[in-house]
Structure formats: structure tokens, C-alpha cells
């Protein structure tokens, strides 16, 4: 009987010790970010391009909610600004493809935009789904999933101020091909900035120059998005350097 008691006590102690060693995260988004920033993590981060556009309109709140239920780690969304300076989710310059209205986003006020309904796949107009604001998208994603804001450069000030107001600067990512110094200058006016990832066209001279500027200056971003048309020495060396420096590799698998 004593041996049995000792066995259960030892097992309980092992479980407690194991639990104590597990990192504690405030929310799911924080856990995903920790996996990305851990150079030893083999976790594969899954990013959804404009949300679940097969079942809902792309860049819509239902499309975001759907991928969160699926367990996706990051939502890629696109931003445009209305005539009255409201940031909304839209990939195209016009609303023609994604709503039952017509016109440039920049020529339409937010209230006017709300009179139209969004379209899903096969040009089917929904009964009530509206183009969401960036604020609404942030509210939906906060603490639940990371966000990659595409087409963000022209609206960086508004995006970073909104993210800071909502306590989400560490949850929102933007990417680009600007030089290290240009990125630093763009971010200098702000106390808290968005996460940043360089895009590297490794088969092109400018892409190689940008990548090896990071390497030679010892600057390690959270990840590199590497684009290439041909496999070869350029790509192999790039991937090897990324592994060596402890960063991560972002690959677009849908192309």
C-alpha cells in the first residue's frame, strides 16, 4: 500500500513539475507570437489570405471568425481609406468586385459604403454582410489571432495609432521591401510600432542586396518573406542564412 501511495505521489509531482515548466500566455495571440520568436520552435504558423473567402466574402468579419474557429494563426487583410478617412477592409481600389455598388473606395464616404452589401464567391451578393472597418476587424482579432495588414504603407500612421489605442501593436504585422534605414525612419515618429517583416525577392539583385544588408548588419527580424521563381544557389544560401541567424521563413504556398 505504501509503495502505491509513493507511486501516486511521484506521478503527481511529475505532473505538477511539467505544468510548472509550461510557459503561461495571456492569450492565444501571445502564444503564436512566442512560437514565431522562438528560434528553436518547429511550429508551422498558418496564415489565411483574406480569410475564409470560399464560404464568406473575403476580408469580411464572418470570414475572419471562420478561420479563427479553424485554428488559423494569422489573418492577412487589406486596407483602403474612404473619402472621409475611414480605414476599411478592401483589396481592390474599387468596390465593384466585392460589393453590389460601384466606384473607388477613395471617392465613397463610409456611410455611403454601408448602403451596399458584400459579395462572396461566384459573384453572389449577401443579404446583410457589410464592408468592415479596420477597427471592427481589430476588435474581432484582438488576443485571438495575429494580423498581417497588407497594403499598409500608405496608411501606416492611422494603422499604428489604432493598434496602439487598442493595445495591439505587438499583434499586428506589416511587410515590405524598403531598406532597413527607410523602415527605421518611417517608424521613428512612433513610440510603439507594428511588427515588421522584410520581403526578399532572392532571385533579383535588389532583393539580394536587401537580404544581405540584414545579414551583414546583424539585424534579425521575426521572419523573412522569401519570393523566388527558380530554385538554386541563391535560394539555398538564403534559407541557410535565415536558419543560422535564428529567424523564420515565410513562404506563400498558394502561388
Q: Model features per residue range: what roles?
A:
Residues 19-255:
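Phosphate-group recognition and catalysis centered on beta-loop-alpha active-site segments
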Amino acid at each position: 500500500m505504501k509503495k502505491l501511495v509513493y507511486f501516486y505521489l511521484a506521478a503527481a509531482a511529475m505532473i505538477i513539475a511539467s505544468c510548472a515548466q509550461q510557459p503561461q500566455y495571456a492569450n492565444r495571440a501571445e502564444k503564436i507570437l512566442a512560437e514565431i520568436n522562438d528560434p528553436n520552435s518547429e511550429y508551422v504558423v498558418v496564415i489565411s489570405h483574406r480569410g475564409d473567402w470560399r464560404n464568406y466574402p473575403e476580408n469580411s468579419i464572418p470570414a475572419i471568425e471562420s478561420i479563427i474557429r479553424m485554428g488559423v494563426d494569422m489573418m492577412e487583410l487589406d486596407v483602403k481609406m474612404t473619402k472621409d478617412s475611414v480605414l476599411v477592409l478592401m483589396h481592390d481600389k474599387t468596390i465593384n468586385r466585392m460589393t453590389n455598388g460601384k466606384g473607388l473606395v477613395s471617392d465613397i464616404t463610409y456611410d455611403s459604403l454601408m448602403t451596399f452589401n458584400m459579395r462572396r464567391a461566384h459573384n453572389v451578393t449577401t443579404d446583410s454582410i457589410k464592408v468592415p472597418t479596420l477597427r471592427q476587424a481589430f476588435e474581432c482579432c484582438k488576443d485571438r489571432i495575429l494580423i498581417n495588414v497588407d497594403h499598409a504603407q500608405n496608411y501606416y500612421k492611422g494603422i499604428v495609432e489604432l493598434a496602439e489605442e487598442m493595445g495591439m501593436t505587438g499583434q499586428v504585422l506589416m511587410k515590405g521591401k524598403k531598406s532597413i534605414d527607410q523602415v527605421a525612419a518611417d517608424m521613428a515618429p512612433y513610440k510603439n510600432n507594428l511588427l515588421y517583416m522584410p520581403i526578399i525577392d532572392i532571385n533579383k539583385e535588389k532583393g539580394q542586396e536587401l537580404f544581405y544588408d540584414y545579414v551583414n548588419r546583424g539585424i534579425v527580424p521575426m521572419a523573412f518573406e522569401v519570393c523566388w521563381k527558380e530554385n538554386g544557389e541563391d535560394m539555398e544560401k538564403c534559407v541557410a542564412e535565415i536558419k543560422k541567424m535564428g529567424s523564420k521563413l515565410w513562404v506563400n504556398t498558394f502561388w
